[in-house]
Design a protein with these regions (language model features):
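HTH-adjacent hinge/linker in prokaryotic transcriptional regulators
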Residues: 1-7, 33-34, 44-123, 142, ...
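Short helix->loop/beta-hairpin flanking segments within DNA-binding domains
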Residues: 5-24
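A short alpha-helical element within helix-turn-helix/winged-helix DNA-binding domains
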Residues: 17, 24-35, 49
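Hydrophobic beta-strand signal
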Residues: 32, 125, 217-218
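C-terminal regulatory/effector modules of DNA-binding transcriptional regulators
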Residues: 119, 136, 145, 149, ...
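Hydrophobic beta-strand positions
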Residues: 129-131, 223-224
């Protein structure tokens, strides 16, 4: 287990209230022994949490939790904006924006996907896209959906289903102003989004070319159908100096 994984585990315990505000965490020595790692690794885990403002460490009192109980800041309930002018992302100031699909794969859903409403072991399709500005990766976006959803095609379309187009090949796009969901005939009722700031996992950091465990925004969007079943999930990651924006119409 590396420092990032230990930090993620401790962060979850803080969020769940196992370590409430003001509580003292294990010493570096005890944390290292608990996870079978070096004291340097344990110290790095606390440093990662400290960078997020979740803990404070000093020589006299050790490491204590500074995070308060987790809350939700709900930005509103709204309908999709005009898709003819909507942009999923863009450079904040200037630069050339590009986007590339780097991975398309089929796999059995791991246990952690149950939190998104996907049954463990179900066949899913995972698509990864890297967004760049002037050739430098800035955002990592992963989309996960049940295989049955990914295999759908527009009426009259012949060829590989758009969501199954391999990485590196041109994928057909929905006509301008039409949602992909409508184009592919998906039943879409609502999307729930959650934005957190936390250490990014190793694969994302590698894709963005940044140090492992670097903190970042994690934006999870779970889209469900009229029966409450998960249609697809998107997980977008970006470093903390980026911005997350939202338009609420009306």
């Amino acid at each position: 287990m590396d420092a990032s994984a230990i930090a993620a585990q401790l962060r979850q315990k803080i969020i769940e209230g196992e370590y409430p505000h003001g509580s003292k965490l294990p010493t570096v020595r005890d944390l290292a022994a608990e996870h079978g790692v070096s004291q340097q690794t344990a110290s790095a885990a606390y440093a990662a949490l400290g960078a997020l403002g979740l803990v404070r460490t000093d020589a006299r009192s050790g490491t204590r939790v500074t995070a308060s109980r987790q809350t939700d800041a709900h930005l509103g309930t709204f309908t999709p904006p005009d898709l003819s002018i909507a942009q999923a992302w863009k450079p904040t100031a200037q630069g050339t924006a590009t986007e590339e699909t780097t991975l398309v794969r089929q796999l059995d859903a791991p246990a952690q996907m149950t939190a998104w409403g996907i049954t463990e072991g179900a066949t899913v399709v995972e698509r990864t896209r890297i967004r760049s500005v002037d050739g430098v990766p800035v955002q990592h976006k992963m989309t996960v959906m049940p295989y049955g959803i990914a295999a759908k095609v527009p009426d009259g379309y012949e060829g590989t289903p758009p969501m199954l187009t391999p990485a590196g090949e041109a994928s057909p796009k929905a006509p301008a102003g039409i949602r992909v969901a409508d184009w592919l005939g998906w039943d879409i009722a609502r999307t729930e989004s959650a934005i957190t700031a936390e250490p990014m996992d190793e694969a994302i950091c590698a894709a963005l070319g940044i140090p492992a465990g670097a903190p970042g925004f994690r934006i999870v969007g779970i889209t469900r159908n009229s029966e409450g079943e998960t249609v697809f999930v998107t997980i977008t990651s970006a470093q903390l100096h980026h911005r997350v924006t939202l338009d609420i119409i009306g």
